[in-house]
Design a protein with these regions (language model features):
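Non-catalytic structural scaffold of enzyme domains
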Residues: 1-173
Length: 173
């Protein structure tokens, strides 16, 4: 919100949603009230499949993942990153480059998530890094969790892309 407030060309309507309640968030504002949706992770992918409005994804950059892994650095237990491929691909890249001893578990959908985290618990993982839904599911199973957050730059990049898209649609590219 702070980044959008600095941009006079952006009128921002915010709704908080995740893989469990994305439909409620989408339906809470008339589609005629906005030109583009900005979201991240699996929620962005779900919205892109079902919303009639273009969806811009806040990507999880290597920097975002590095910050999240660094925040977990002092943790002594077995660590796993769980999420959709747009999150886990970055984690896998970093694990290989930095030689981090972490488990990376991609999921396809919400149904996969609970089973994946349950299996990770059985494998001895006790810290799960992921999105909001992963974090909540891990806590339901008695595991520690940390949210993978998006950097200011990742959000700024998504805002820039949204403005470019709307201008192109309006013929002002």
């Amino acid at each position: 919100q702070q980044l959008a407030a600095q941009r006079p060309e952006i009128q921002l309507i915010t709704r908080i949603g995740n893989l469990r309640n994305w439909q409620d968030a989408l339906n809470s504002v008339p589609a005629s009230s906005y030109d583009v949706i900005i979201s991240r992770g699996g929620t962005a992918r779900m919205l892109a499949r079902f919303a009639r409005t273009p969806v811009i994804e806040i990507t999880t950059s290597v920097y975002d993942m590095l910050c999240s892994l660094r925040n977990a650095q002092g943790y002594t237990g077995k660590i796993a990153v769980v999420g959709h491929s747009n999150i886990t691909e970055r984690a896998q890249q970093l694990a290989e480059i930095m030689q981090y001893d972490i488990v990376v578990r991609p999921i396809r959908d919400n149904a996969d998530l609970h089973q994946a985290i349950l299996q990770l618990k059985q494998e001895g993982c006790n810290l799960i890094l992921g999105d909001n839904v992963s974090q909540h599911s891990a806590e339901e199973l008695g595991l520690n969790s940390m949210l993978i957050t998006s950097s200011e730059q990742s959000v700024q990049d998504a805002l820039d892309e949204a403005v470019r898209l709307v201008r192109a649609q309006d013929g002002f590219a």
